């Protein structure tokens, strides 16, 4: 599916002054890490977020199927809940999916899960994407654009959308300022990296002060992070209302 007109307006921001970009990824394979060990309390009690059903299949299954459909992706590694039951359930779900999909035990946090999956990748994987299972409807075009940007020489790449709402800074219940949204972008996944950049970023990270995404770890090193246009359908399914929206998108696709 091609990107919608709104996503075409997302700026591809050039990095400002700073350290030179890391070397290009080289000819190695492309792997995607899917951290799927989180509980996802905002969706309410029940199964882990990645295992919540959408249209009769878990979010994780939708996400892995889409990744497998991307021609540039060679391998998907799912970081599953570390308990035996959760690990076995994820292994069962992905066993018959297309493509090369492997499962490793995740950690106590998203950051730890990504680090564990990264350490388990085969040595010939030169490009590594990290993708939220909860962004189960991300179009293949977004995945391909991220990979192409890394292959083209970027050390870190994120898909983004312009911010549509007016943004206010507040102190308690008082507005203190209206934020200029012209330079703001909403960040999506998959986020793409050369393996060296992502490995270096996780090695330097502080588990006591986790970043909200992997690009944040790269930023902390002072390395540039590039952008490509995201897509409205790559939204994160986090709340019950998001599930309603996702069901509507699925019905339209069918």
Regions found by a protein language model. Give the residues of each.
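N-terminal glycine-rich phosphate-binding loop and ensuing alpha1 helix
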Residues: 2-10, 22-85
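Hydrophobic helical membrane-anchoring modules
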Residues: 2-4, 8-10, 16, 237-254
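Short, conserved active-site loop motifs that form the nucleotide-linked donor/cofactor pocket
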Residues: 30, 100-102, 184
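Residue-level signal for inorganic ion chemistry
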Residues: 34, 60, 117, 131-132, ...
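Acidic helix N-cap motif at the loop->helix transition within catalytic regions
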Residues: 85-92
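Short phosphate-binding loop-to-helix
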Residues: 93-127
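Conserved core of the sugar-phosphate nucleotidyltransferase
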Residues: 138-226
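Catalytic beta-strand/loop signature of glycosyltransferases that borders the donor
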Residues: 226-233
